[in-house]
Amino acid sequence: DGSGTVAMLEIAQAFKQASKKGKGPKRSIVFLHVTGEEKGLLGSAYYADNPIYPLENTVTNLNLDMIGRIDPTRKGDKREYIYIIGSDHDSQDLHNLSEQTNLETVNLDLDYRYNAKDDPNRFYYRSDHYNFAKNGIPIIFYFSGTHPDYHLPSDTPDKIEYDLLELRSKLVFYTAWNIANRDERIKVDPKPEVKKFEVDKDILDGYAGNYGAEGIPLKIGVFIRDNNLFIEVMSQAVQLDALADDVFGSEAMGLKITFDTENGTMEFKQGPYNIKLKRE
């Protein structure tokens, strides 16, 4: 519905007006409008690989993706809300700043119902902030939820709740303002070191090929690129992480794949789906 785009433009204009009055932010701000999200977060992935400023100097990513409608469960006297996803995943400091900023400004109901990484909707992994989060950059994903017009031509501007779009845009502006003007950068929470499971290249070669299942129109290609294992499903390539011997997965996609090279099969698990495929 373009709500995130127009909000970003308004926020950029507000920062520019402040800068002209000599009140510009202490930190640089990149207003990033990316495309290809539905094809696999392509635009944000490209930026993460080719950033304007080094990722290690990137303090925070604030992602506005659908902030102009009302979730059917939040109508009536519960309409002044925004779903917050990811604010506490990598930085309690960012989460606290977000909460305090909201209390001191628009005072929306910050709803965390979709915040868990294992939420079955997997919203945390499905929008462009994820390409920053997976690089260790704290993020906040602002989201008003799905609705009957989700991804349909019927999602037209007349259905936008403009008063809520304004409040939500102000919240993001004030949050960005506080982050950009504080003396210290947002603190990232320490993470326990996870040892990566390594697999030799010759073993990876044994998994490569095209897999299919009888009676199911599902084809999965498995290939190696830069000593990493990938699968291709519906023209989308997904890199897999080695989890154990013959076991690979993708946290972002909620995938787990187990290979049986002796029988030339793979077991594909994603959510409620568990499919056995054979190499063709």
Q: Which residues does each predicted region cover?
A:
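Peripheral terminal and inter-domain segments
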Residues: 190-280
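Sec-exported extracytoplasmic/periplasmic mature domains
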Residues: 10-20, 49-53, 99-107, 134-137, ...
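Alpha-helical metal-binding/catalytic segments enriched in His/Glu/Asp
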Residues: 1-41, 172
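Soluble non-cytosolic domains of exported or imported proteins
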Residues: 2-6, 38-42, 88-93, 126, ...
